[in-house]
UniProtKB/Swiss-Prot annotation:
InterPro entries tied to this protein: Ribosomal_bL17, Ribosomal_bL17_sf
Keyword Magnesium found: no
Similarity annotation: Belongs to the bacterial ribosomal protein bL17 family.
Gene Ontology terms: biological process: translation
Protein name as it appears in the record: Large ribosomal subunit protein bL17
Length: 116
């Protein structure tokens, strides 16, 4: 049964879903914005905000957790350097989801997720 399922399944097995979200999180932190489907953007928001919260905390343990999740090690170090000054006064809500036009091929709802 599907009662109280906290994460969206995204029609993928667990390993593929985790790899997809890791890749999207890495790309979002690198580029600042990602265009994807609305369901993926909503799932990505949780992971990206978790990584930014770890970066704001700044401890060695949180840095190691972020290195274990984000694919690019240099990107993690730059995130930890910039997160406190960029998001220091903000308690969550580090991302914004903006809906865009539907995808032409399958009419999927698309969205742009960007860092605030």
């Amino acid at each position: 049964m599907r009662h109280q399922l906290r994460i969206p399944l995204l029609s993928k097995p667990a390993d593929q879903r985790k790899a997809l979200l890791r890749g999207l999180t890495t790309q979002l932190i690198r580029e600042g914005r990602v265009t994807t489907t609305k369901a993926r953007a909503k799932a990505l928001r949780n992971e990206a905000e978790r990584m930014i919260s770890l970066a704001k905390e700044g401890s060695l343990a949180s840095r190691r957790r972020a290195i274990g999740y984000i694919y690019d090690k240099k990107l993690v170090h730059s995130l930890f350097e910039k997160a406190k000054e960029r998001y220091g006064d903000r308690n969550g809500g580090y991302t914004r989801i903006v809906r865009t036009v539907s995808r032409k091929g399958d009419n999927a709802q698309m969205a742009i997720i960007e860092l605030v």
